[in-house]
Amino acid sequence: MHALQAKILDPRIGNEFPLPAYATPGSAGLDLRAMLKEDTVLEPGQTLLIPTGLSIYVGDPGLAALILPRSGLGHKHGIVLGNLVGLIDSDYQGELMVSCWNRGQTAFNIAVGERIAQLVLVPVVQAHFELVEEFDETQRGAGGFGHSGSH
């Protein structure tokens, strides 16, 4: 297991609300909580930047963190991330913020401390460009959207 340095920026974490933890041995994500000053209503079509009360430092350039939506919020309530995925670079040290978007048709109440997103560590491979005049030919070639089937 990789050690992830974290700072608690909101004193309610660790007291009123638990530190992020894996729910099961097979869990990939750590739940992030909405550390708002008060319960907030997110109207249809509205976006809101929500503090998590945590900052992290991954430190290893071979890793990055992703902030992803919680599947139940998106499926049941239309609550997703405003930027779809939040990418946290290994050298970022600021507070984790969640861009929350209500794409649903009804207002959604976000309670203080509610689990609003999840944090997942992923491996990163950095690449450099090797400039070429032509690519080796492949069966697909430059075929793009819809090229490999009718849907």
From Swiss-Prot:
The keyword Magnesium applies. Its cofactor is Mg(2+). It holds the Pfam family dUTPase. Substrate binds at R70, S71, G72, N83, L87, I88, D89, M97. Keywords: Hydrolase, Magnesium, Metal-binding, Nucleotide metabolism. It catalyses: dUTP + H2O = dUMP + diphosphate + H(+). The keyword Signal does not apply. Pathway: Pyrimidine metabolism; dUMP biosynthesis; dUMP from dCTP (dUTP route): step 2/2. GO terms for biological process: dUMP biosynthetic process; dUTP catabolic process. SUPFAM superfamilies: dUTPase-like. One of its GO terms (molecular function) is magnesium ion binding. Its EC number is 3.6.1.23. This enzyme is involved in nucleotide metabolism: it produces dUMP, the immediate precursor of thymidine nucleotides and it decreases the intracellular concentration of dUTP so that uracil cannot be incorporated into DNA. Belongs to the dUTPase family. This is Deoxyuridine 5'-triphosphate nucleotidohydrolase. The lineage of its organism: Bacteria, Pseudomonadati, Pseudomonadota, Gammaproteobacteria, Pseudomonadales.
